[in-house]
Amino acid sequence: MKILLLCTAHNSLSQRLYLTLTLKHEVTVEYALSTDTMIEAASLAHPHLIICPFLTSTVPTEVYTKYMTLIVHPGAPGDGGPSALDFMLMGEDGTDEDIERVITKDLWSEHGRSHWGVTVLQAIEKFDAGPVWAWEQFKVNIDDHTITKSSLYRGDVTRAALIACSTAIERIELAARQTKATKTGEAVDWECISPGLETKPEYRTASASTGEPFLGGHTCPLPLLKAANRGFDVHRHGARMISRLIRASDSQPGCLTRNFSPNLYVYGGLIEDCEHMSTIEVKPGTFIGVRNDAVCFKTLDGKGIWITHGRRVKRKTDPTLWPKVPAIPLFVDLGIVDLKKLPQFLPLLPEDFAKLDYPTFQELYVEYDEIATGQRVAYLTFDFYNGAMSTNQCRQMCAALRSILETHTDSNPLSAVVLLGGTYFSNGIHLNVIESSPDPAHESWANINAINDVILFVLHDFAVRGITTVAALRGNAAAGGVALAAAADLVLAGEHVVMNPAYRALGLFGSEYHTITYHGRVGHDAGHHLLRDMLPVSAHQAKDIGLVDVVLPGYGESLDTAIHKHVSELVSTNQKPGRWKHNLDLSPLALATTRMQELGEMAKDFWSARSIRYHSRRSDFVRKVKATKTPLRFARHRRKVGELDEEESDSFDLIETFAMLVRKTQEQAMQQTIEQLKMQARRASTPATVEEKDKRQLEMLFSCYYGS
């Protein structure tokens, strides 16, 4: 079947769906940049089926009336609107359909819904109201303070979406067979798939996997949840509600708070409930502690809330969004806190990185496990926001790894160390911190060297002591995060993990010793394709080529159990993984040479004329600048013979290519300046007319910078 994915962005859900569908179908992707773009894409692809896994705009009538078009909605049947997950995580439970009253009077549910779902429905004129082809549900606990909208989306929502989409496709195939009375075993005539196919009533009432009705309560269409309705009041809301509001707004747009001056979007929402909280006698909203660039404030019910990140509010005069950065640097810059005067009522983290046994903010900790044979294993959990690892966070990780090494003695040896990421394993360097730096190139250099130091521990320091290293991917990984995993002796990955090894799409050569680890693991040719194709890779695909060693079933607690079981068996049977290293020179000299060569290329990416490719792409990514077109590597329906994306060409690596671009840009800027000076010279005689022409010209040239 030919399937077209229409999406606002090729995100974690659409990538997972793409990888699943391509096993059986011919799939192509188009960014929904405009109505005309979507109509043109459908015309070029001429698909049998269109699926919209992540779409924030309306499907054009010309598309859904001609092609069977499915919308993946992150809500249960009957729910509708763009803020489904947000409302659910805040405590909307369907008992009161007057959502404005719920918001204004804080009539949120005490415990929230027990279940939520994902619905695959057919696109029609009315938003999220078409015939249901399939839906799936999952359990949810909205007061688990570690769950955010984005982590729920990457986890349970994505898994449910895959089940619902697969079921919907099967049902559409069945309906197509029935329209032409195709015999069992005969190939389906895909041309029979049309918007006129009819669903069955039970598709709306019974879940795809179990056939059960929706167990999460009554649902109804809900409006867009505006930023003004997401804020918290420290004099009215307790820790649980504030946590809900912040976590429900995670990723986009953030929780807009007016409790600090100036107003800003905040992220995090983790609850602090240490035994000392009852002794801290300060007003609600008062800052009571700092930890790893996060800040905690007191709540009216005697607990605390951690703000880990913040973002300035975009003004009408701001060309783009501001970066999302760690809270403390932002708060200091805005004058919200003075570190010299900020009290520290909360206990410090343990020096040995032990896990705390009460609700708090702790993004990195170590647990030691002694298996039945008496051998010791260290589990290092690191759960950095959005998987990004800043310079400071990399240094913290190095300190934790050093602490683990110090426990390894002749009398009490350590057999293995396991790197456990969080809902993301790692996405490499912290682009938002880099973008917000006064000198992004310098911060990029510091960050890449810091993450290289982390990987050197994995490749060398543990290896020379005979300690097995294991990377256990419970969540997605990208760029330097994939290289971090690849450096381990053994890579375990959950079956739902998606990996994006390439750096080029961001305009980087990449470091993290990837030129030696990828070569050792997958070979030269496969490694070249990993980096140049710039396509997502599933856990099973990664295993097929050697990037992953073992794919484990399950997720959540079941995956954790599988990881511990596999590591215990590995250690107890004295297995020595890491065969990929056997023919490699991993001596200190070879590693230093590799690092120097990679950093030589990265220096070009940070400071030479070629740096344009990285600095511009990083800025667009961080500030959420809308793409101008879909990359041809995704939009197969647009690619002509021999046609390449800019990042796919060899010239993308040449400094000369970008030096010419710099000269051309400078010439255009000079010409623009000359034209503006000419306008100013004429302004005295015809001021009104010239001002209007000048205004229109600026809007045309800089329209992308002056959106509200």
PLM segments and residue spans:
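Fungal intrinsically disordered, low-complexity serine/threonine- and proline-rich regulatory regions
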Residues: 661-708
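Donor/substrate-binding cores of folate-linked one-carbon enzymes
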Residues: 2-4, 55-218
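Conserved CoA-thioester-binding segment of acyl-CoA-metabolizing enzymes
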Residues: 320, 324-418
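Crotonase-fold acyl-CoA enzyme core
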Residues: 461-467, 472-476, 487-498, 502-577
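A structural preference for short, pocket-lining loop segments at secondary-structure junctions
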Residues: 375-377, 394-442, 453-470, 496-498, ...
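C-terminal long alpha-helix characteristic of the crotonase
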Residues: 548-613
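A short beta-strand-loop structural module common to alpha/beta enzyme folds
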Residues: 25-37
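An anion-binding loop in the catalytic cleft
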Residues: 1-9, 192, 201-220, 225-362, ...
